[in-house]
């Protein structure tokens, strides 16, 4: 569906002309507002409360209409703290849904749920805005062609490839390299696909959001000198904010991504960290809105809310939005309604392993736990599929043999198993890769490896042609030619030492 962005100042009347209501009840982040007969606002309309609190401080709170209660009353959820609001305060109906700035002006900047910049870098051009509520693209506008979204990261492209316009779940604890992987994907989509990224921080820690921003500036993903040359827009609704903001910040980020897809006709990466917090925020306000709780206390509208967000993330004939969503699994229970509802929408899962991170293998993507619906011969081709399956079989066999190796040692294995272990260790190391965004920390230049190069490299390892090379030659290199060159260098170095 093509976006028709609104231009401020033309169609939207000023706040002074709007119809006025009054607050009749406040319960936490939820307000009831009475309007004159026949002047009821529509659902999802933005309401603005302006005034002064008892201490004389100015108040400016934006709310969103959620329910029409009858008796000329509406129930709305506040997007910021309701401290200082009192019954009888004037409420202005803006006559439209929340609208946020879109387009190139958003790149390199940090926004809140209302599309206001929060990075102290001055105002943003708001001439082009877009409402955060929109229906998903019509079926006829969708691009149904199955195509792989090449990331340039070997382990992802070979074993759990991403679908162009698909949704990927990113599972990983703290300190296993989620942020670095996210930044590398942002960097690679900009270089290889000429695309941009939008990062939606949904209910995440303020510290993490700040760290991500600082690391993006360090690695050049955000260009401080020429802000318009940045590759990412950031939208944050942090943990300390009311549930209304956390519930809608994902839609704000998605609206910015949709503009890049539909108007600029670009490939867009949309990161949502964390999709569970989106559900959690909805469940927090659900009871206050008078809804009966569903399973495990979640909102009864869980599937609908998730669907309305996820169905807008798709490929159209203009461009694509590929979404990578960090998924928190409460108490590691995959049957919990929140992650279970999310899984229904995912095309691929990328699982980060603490064990691999401890070994120093980065990206620490678990090659056996990560999955993708794209890894089928009819989509990726017979050669890619066969190579991926053989890599997985070799790694699986190595995993099965590890207990025997730990107890009895390598010497007790059969000749065939020893060969499998040697190749598996080479594969494990070859799945590591130096990242562009980590150059500033590691000093080794980043590598983008095309899919054909990746497949060729693993085929050579599996065929046994490279059995004579030391396994450290495969660690943190790009393609297989670099591994053979590194092996020669290691040989020269060892001779010089002698």
Curated annotation (Swiss-Prot):
Residues annotated as binding ATP: 172-179
Domain of life: Eukaryota
Transmembrane segments: none
Family matches, as InterPro entries: AAA+_ATPase (IPR003593), ATP-synt_VA_C (IPR055190), ATP_synth_F1_bsu (IPR005722), ATPase_a/bsu_AS (IPR020003), ATPase_alpha/beta_chains (IPR050053), ATPase_F1/V1/A1_a/bsu_N (IPR004100), ATPase_F1/V1/A1_a/bsu_N_sf (IPR036121), ATPase_F1/V1/A1_a/bsu_nucl-bd (IPR000194)
Cellular compartment(s): Plastid, Chloroplast thylakoid membrane
GO terms for MF: ATP binding; ATP hydrolysis activity; proton-transporting ATP synthase activity, rotational mechanism
Any Gene Ontology biological process: proton motive force-driven mitochondrial ATP synthesis
Family matches, as SUPFAM superfamilies: C-terminal domain of alpha and beta subunits of F1 ATP synthase (SSF47917), N-terminal domain of alpha and beta subunits of F1 ATP synthase (SSF50615), P-loop containing nucleoside triphosphate hydrolases (SSF52540)
Enzyme class of the recorded protein, top EC level: translocase
Membrane topology: Peripheral membrane protein
UniProt family annotation: Belongs to the ATPase alpha/beta chains family.
HAMAP family linked: ATP_synth_beta_bact
Record note on quaternary structure: F-type ATPases have 2 components, CF(1) - the catalytic core - and CF(0) - the membrane proton channel. CF(1) has five subunits: alpha(3), beta(3), gamma(1), delta(1), epsilon(1). CF(0) has four main subunits: a(1), b(1), b'(1) and c(9-12).
Protein name: ATP synthase subunit beta, chloroplastic
């Amino acid at each position: 569906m093509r976006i028709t962005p609104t231009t401020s100042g033309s169609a939207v009347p000023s706040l002074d002309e709007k119809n006025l209501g009054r607050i009749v009840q406040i319960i936490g982040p939820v307000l009831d507002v009475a309007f004159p007969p026949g002047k009821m606002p529509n659902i999802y309309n933005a309401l603005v409360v302006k005034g002064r609190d008892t201490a004389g401080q100015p108040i400016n709170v934006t709310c969103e209409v959620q329910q029409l209660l009858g008796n000329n009353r509406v129930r709305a959820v506040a997007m910021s703290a309701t401290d200082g609001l009192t019954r009888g305060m004037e409420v202005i109906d803006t006559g439209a849904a929340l609208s946020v700035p879109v387009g190139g002006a958003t790149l390199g900047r940090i926004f809140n749920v209302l599309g206001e910049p929060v990075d102290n870098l001055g105002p943003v051009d708001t001439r082009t805005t877009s409402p955060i509520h929109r229906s998903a693209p019509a079926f006829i506008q969708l691009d149904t062609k199955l195509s792989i979204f090449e990331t340039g990261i070997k382990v992802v492209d070979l074993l759990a490839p991403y679908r162009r316009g698909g949704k990927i779940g990113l599972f990983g604890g703290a300190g296993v390299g989620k942020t670095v992987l996210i930044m590398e994907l942002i960097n690679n989509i900009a270089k290889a696909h000429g695309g941009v990224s939008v990062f939606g921080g949904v209910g995440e820690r303020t510290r993490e959001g700040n760290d991500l921003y600082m690391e993006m500036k360090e690695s050049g993903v955000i260009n401080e000198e020429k802000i318009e040359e940045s590759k990412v827009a950031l939208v944050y609704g942090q943990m300390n904010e009311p549930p209304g903001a956390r519930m809608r910040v994902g839609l704000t980020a998605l609206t910015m991504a949709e503009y890049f897809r539909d108007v600029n006709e670009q490939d867009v990466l949309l990161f949502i960290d964390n999709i569970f917090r989106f559900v959690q925020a909805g469940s927090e306000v659900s009871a206050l809105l008078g809804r009966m709780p569903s399973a495990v206390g979640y909102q009864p509208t869980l599937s609908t809310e998730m669907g309305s967000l996820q169905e807008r993330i798709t490929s159209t004939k203009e461009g694509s939005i590929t979404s990578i969503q960090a998924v928190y699994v409460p108490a590691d229970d995959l049957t919990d309604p929140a992650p279970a509802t999310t899984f229904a929408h995912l095309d691929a899962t990328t699982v980060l392993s603490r064990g691999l991170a401890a070994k120093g293998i980065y990206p620490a993507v678990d090659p056996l736990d990560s999955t993708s619906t794209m890894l089928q011969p009819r989509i990726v081709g017979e050669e890619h599929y066969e190579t991926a399956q053989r890599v997985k079989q070799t790694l699986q066999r190595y995993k099965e043999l590890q207990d025997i190796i730990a107890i009895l040692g390598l010497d007790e294995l059969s000749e065939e198993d020893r060969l499998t272990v040697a190749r598996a260790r080479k594969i494990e190391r070859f799945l590591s890769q130096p990242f562009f965004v980590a150059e500033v920390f590691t000093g080794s230049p980043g590598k983008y490896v095309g899919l054909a190069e990746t497949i060729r490299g693993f085929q050579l390892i599996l065929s046994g042609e490279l059995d004579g090379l030391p396994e450290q030659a495969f660690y943190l290199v790009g393609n297989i030619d670099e591994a053979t060159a590194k092996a020669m260098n290691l040989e020269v170095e060892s001779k010089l030492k002698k």
